[in-house]
Design a protein with these regions (language model features):
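Short, well-ordered loop/turn sites that connect or cap secondary structure elements
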Residues: 73-80
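Conserved nucleotide-binding/hydrolysis micro-motifs of P-loop NTPases
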Residues: 12-16, 92, 142
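Structural motif
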Residues: 83-85
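Aromatic- and Lys/Arg-enriched surface recognition patch
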Residues: 94-143
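Short connector loops at helix/strand junctions that flank enzyme active sites
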Residues: 80-81, 94
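Compositionally biased, charged N-terminal/linker segments
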Residues: 1-72
Length: 143
């Protein structure tokens, strides 16, 4: 059995993303932004073609390549079932909570489970920049 990897994942994002992200985390889903990229086709492209798939999408949108694209890369490609994720600021900014990735499914806005869809009101959902989700379980809160 491979040793698990450890990741730090800071939750932030557009207006209302913080609140919805924390609701998702309470319900067992870790989230990341990139809603403009959110599709299962994009996930498959990243898994097959690596970071170049992210870079290509950036360039199609006429965006300059930025370092934060590596956060999306780690979320989609490097995080695996059994890995641990340290999330600062949840439930408060003074502490870190630890979660474990429970499977290798990556959800996007075109295949999200009903329990994700039901979180947040319509106004929050429209304004939040959330695009990808991973199922997690709590290991330790408020460390």
């Amino acid at each position: 059995m491979e040793k698990p990897d450890y990741f730090m994942h800071r939750i932030n994002g557009g207006k209302n993303a913080f609140e919805i992200s924390h609701k998702l985390l309470e319900s067992g889903y870790l989230s990341i932004g990139w809603s403009d990229f959110s599709s299962q086709q994009f996930v498959q492209d990243v898994i097959k073609n690596g970071i170049s798939a992210i870079d290509e999408k950036y360039q199609l949108e006429h965006w300059a390549l930025s370092r934060n694209r590596w956060c999306l890369w780690r979320f989609l490609k490097e995080m695996q079932s059994g890995d641990y994720v340290l999330v600062p600021g949840f439930p408060n900014w003074e502490n870190v909570s630890i979660y474990k990735i429970v499977d290798n499914t990556i959800y996007s806005n075109d295949n999200m489970p009903n329990d994700i869809k039901s979180l947040g009101d319509e106004r929050e959902k429209e304004q939040a920049d959330l695009g990808f989700y991973r199922k997690v379980e709590v290991v330790k809160k408020d460390v």
